[in-house]
């Protein structure tokens, strides 16, 4: 707190974001609307979904994650790069976990080829657990029994609390870990990317959601300042955000290697970290936690923002009569 003015906190965003969207009359939620393709007509964008519906709007922002369909059509740059690790997740009632864990902090356990992160949610009533280990294959396929055996082997020398955490995992909730190399440009015309769709990163700096939130605020400012020129707005947005998010991606890879190192490499990392004091560590992270310098734009009043957003709101049209 003395260095960065604010404490490190964990926020369960799911319900907060959903409730905020439901309260906003200019937002329409369309569940189970899987996007199949889009068409940029230069004056508007049409988005087609797999169930045959078509939506039209002033622009399209693809915030559809690391396996973004928007990105696939926009740049056709292939799949994310798996790094050989698999992640397992679960959220359990805090009372179900009998081992002694700290209830008010984010905790990381790390070793050669594996790590576990756990932290409390909802005022300490829930415990979020993420366990990661290196596999011999990048495939997400495999039955629960096989994964259980691999986990037991990877964590065979781990602390008893780590083994107790492993017992709480839902092995059906798994995901191959990976990222993408940073890119300079995230848009073409009236279509842009945001968050993991633009700059997916490893979890070692815990900045995926934070970068997406910063993206959103920066993008809103750039659109508000561009007077309807979406190509210019998206260009200003990516210029403002590309270097910062690229650094997060590259530093996350570096930290990931430190987490999972072994042998003499691990000893070197220990020596390097041991040479740093608390103040040194904080200064090493200052570029990240001191915040992002947003573009200097005049933000419109909320009444003006609502009027502008209403003009840009998407409309649903008959797919058969839409422009293609």
What kind of region is each of these model predictions?
Residues 1-93, 136-152, 291-312, 323:
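Conserved N-terminal helical subregion
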Residues 82-84, 101-105, 126, 149, ...:
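A short coil-to-beta-strand element that immediately follows conserved catalytic motifs
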Residues 61-62, 88, 118, 151, ...:
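Conserved mid-domain beta->alpha element of the FAD-binding
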Residues 31, 43, 112-114, 173:
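Short beta-strand or tight-loop elements
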Residues 131, 136-153, 181-182, 201-206:
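Active-site lid/adjacent beta-loop-alpha segment flanking the redox-cofactor pocket in flavoenzymes
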Residues 206, 221-324:
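C-terminal helical "tail/cap" subdomain of flavin- and related membrane-associated enzymes
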Residues 104-139, 148, 155-156:
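Active-site substrate-recognition segment that forms the wall
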Residues 94-101, 138, 225-226:
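Short helix-loop capping/hinge motifs at secondary-structure junctions, enriched
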């Amino acid at each position: 707190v003395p260095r960065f003015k604010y404490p490190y906190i964990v926020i369960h965003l799911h319900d907060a974001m959903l409730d905020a969207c439901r309260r906003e009359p200019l937002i329409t939620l369309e569940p189970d609307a899987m996007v199949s393709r889009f068409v940029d007509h230069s004056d508007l964008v049409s988005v087609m979904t797999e169930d045959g519906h078509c939506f039209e709007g002033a622009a399209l922002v693809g915030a559809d994650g690391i396996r973004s369909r928007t990105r696939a059509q926009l740049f056709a740059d292939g799949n994310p790069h798996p790094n050989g690790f698999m992640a397992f997740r679960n959220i359990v009632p805090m009372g179900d976990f009998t081992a002694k864990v700290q209830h008010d902090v984010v905790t990381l356990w790390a070793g050669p080829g594996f790590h576990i992160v756990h932290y409390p949610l909802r005022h300490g009533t829930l415990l979020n657990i993420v366990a990661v280990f290196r596999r011999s294959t990048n495939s997400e396929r495999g039955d629960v029994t096989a994964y259980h055996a691999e986990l037991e082997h990877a964590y065979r020398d781990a602390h008893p609390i780590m083994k107790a955490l492993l017992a709480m995992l839902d092995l059906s909730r798994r995901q191959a870990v990976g990222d993408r190399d940073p890119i300079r440009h995230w848009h073409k015309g009236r279509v842009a990317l945001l968050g993991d769709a633009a700059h997916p990163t490893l979890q070692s700096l815990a900045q995926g959601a934070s970068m997406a939130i910063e993206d959103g605020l920066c993008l809103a400012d750039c659109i508000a300042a561009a007077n309807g020129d979406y190509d210019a707005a998206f260009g200003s947005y990516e210029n403002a955000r590309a270097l910062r998010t690229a650094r997060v991606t590259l530093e996350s890879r570096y930290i990931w290697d430190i987490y999972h190192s072994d042998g003499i490499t691990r000893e070197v990392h220990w020596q390097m970290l041991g040479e740093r004091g608390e103040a040194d560590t904080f200064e090493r992270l200052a570029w990240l936690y001191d915040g992002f310098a947003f573009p200097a734009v005049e933000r419109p009043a909320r009444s003006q923002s609502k009027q502008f957003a209403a003009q840009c709101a998407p409309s649903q049209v008959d797919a058969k009569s839409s422009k293609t």
